[in-house]
């Protein structure tokens, strides 16, 4: 599918974004192995989170969609830690790295063997990073060419480990913790830098014996999780596209409602403010241990900056759209320590650079980042998203500041995380 995006003079209005993808995955998995029903409000409408539900359904977990007080609900009928049953066929995680990596932690402890694979993008993404700690816990996992899906996971009795993550990764941390729920003894995960802690908060909310320290998580095995009512905040990573859209058009006054403001995720706001963005936080509340609030963004003068060190993994998903902002900022943008971008849905360093160049933007790539001079102007172009949802959406935002209409190839990739993206963009762009 190809989407035409026209230039815009302004971004105005009040809008919402889909339920947070990271939180949705975790709630679906944990509710499935909890005792009794969990009612989840605002579960993500994205294809990735649907993949998680499909996998859990294949493992014997029913879910029911509904509505309450005008809000979408999803009820997951949990069966407890021992309630999963062997799938009749290989599980399909679609495009979702979160699904395959985190669910593998649960599957490693089951009394049966499970195959799990994904689409043509996912089968190119490395899995050794989860296989190593799971093997230390006594799991046996076979991978294609030693590192890639499809995976064959032979369930086993697991033992707790003390594991230091070699690279900051919330997915790997979560995989080990989910396995740790079933393990004998204590499981400890140590991080080089703080990563998103949605798994830890959800585990605590559902009754796990978990201790959270700076960069260290301790989990006692054998916990009995209890189903409950859960609210998924709006996805800040999805909001990022509209925050940047407001910053690259001439006039802006935009409010994004009910956005997740978990401190492990708000580095994006710190980066934008550091570049000069005028962002206000409104009506902050707490739901299931997660902070939620409204964001207001208005016309701002954007200076530019550098993303490096511990900040990089904290904004790794937002770098495509931050690169777009960097090109029109006064001083440009430098991104370092972002080699993880090369093993996302595409090699995002190269895909970002390719499409910036298509729009006549000067950019230099490095092994672990990008160097983008500022004060540049976007030219109308045909954008190649390569089927990567964040590339499609980031360059749709760039198109708002172009000198003519842009065509976004494979624009339907946006449905992986934000099915309503283009309709929402049309509603707020003027």
Language model: regions and residue ranges:
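Structural preference for solvent-exposed beta-strand-turn elements
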Residues: 1-430
């Amino acid at each position: 599918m190809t989407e035409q995006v026209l230039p815009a003079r302004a971004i105005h209005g009040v809008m919402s974004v889909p339920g947070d993808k990271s939180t949705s995955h975790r709630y679906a998995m944990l509710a499935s192995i909890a005792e009794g029903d969990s009612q989840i409000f605002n579960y993500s409408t994205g294809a990735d989170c649907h993949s998680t539900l499909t996998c859990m359904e294949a493992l014997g977990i029913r879910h029911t969609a509904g509505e309450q007080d005008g809000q979408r609900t999803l009820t997951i009928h949990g069966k407890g830690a021992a309630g999963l049953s062997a799938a009749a066929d290989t599980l399909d995680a679609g495009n979702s790295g979160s699904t395959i990596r985190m669910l593998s932690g649960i599957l490693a402890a089951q009394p049966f063997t499970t195959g799990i694979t994904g689409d043509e993008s996912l089968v190119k993404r490395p899995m050794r990073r989860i296989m190593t700690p799971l093997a230390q816990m006594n799991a046996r996992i076979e991978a294609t060419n030693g590192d890639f899906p499809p995976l064959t996971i032979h369930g086993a009795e697991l033992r707790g480990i003390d594991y230091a993550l070699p690279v900051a990764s919330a997915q790997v941390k979560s995989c080990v913790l989910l396995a740790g729920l079933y393990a004998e003894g204590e499981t400890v995960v140590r991080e080089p830098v703080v990563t998103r802690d949605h798994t830890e908060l959800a585990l605590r909310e559902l009754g796990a014996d978990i201790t959270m320290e700076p960069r260290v998580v301790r989990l006692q095995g054998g916990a009995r999780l209890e189903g409950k009512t859960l609210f998924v905040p709006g996805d800040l990573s999805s909001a990022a596209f509209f925050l940047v859209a407001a910053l690259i058009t001439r006039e802006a006054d935009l409010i994004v409602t009910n956005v997740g403001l978990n401190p492990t995720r708000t580095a994006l706001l710190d980066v934008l403010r550091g570049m000069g963005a005028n962002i206000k936080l409104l009506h902050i509340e707490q739901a299931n241990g997660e902070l939620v609030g409204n964001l207001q963004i208005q016309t701002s003068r954007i200076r530019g900056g550098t993303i490096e060190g511990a900040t990089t993994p904290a904004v790794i998903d937002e770098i495509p759209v931050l690169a777009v902002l960097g090109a029109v900022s006064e001083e440009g943008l430098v991104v370092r320590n972002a080699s993880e971008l090369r093993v996302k849905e595409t090699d995002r360093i190269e895909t970002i650079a390719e499409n910036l160049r298509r729009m006549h933007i000067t950019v230099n790539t490095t092994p672990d980042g990008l160097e983008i001079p500022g004060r540049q102007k976007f030219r109308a172009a045909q954008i190649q998203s390569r089927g990567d949802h964040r590339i499609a959406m980031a360059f749709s935002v760039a198109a708002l500041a172009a000198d003519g209409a842009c065509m976004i190839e494979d624009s339907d990739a946006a449905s992986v995380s934000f099915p309503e993206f283009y309709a929402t963009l049309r509603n707020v762009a003027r």
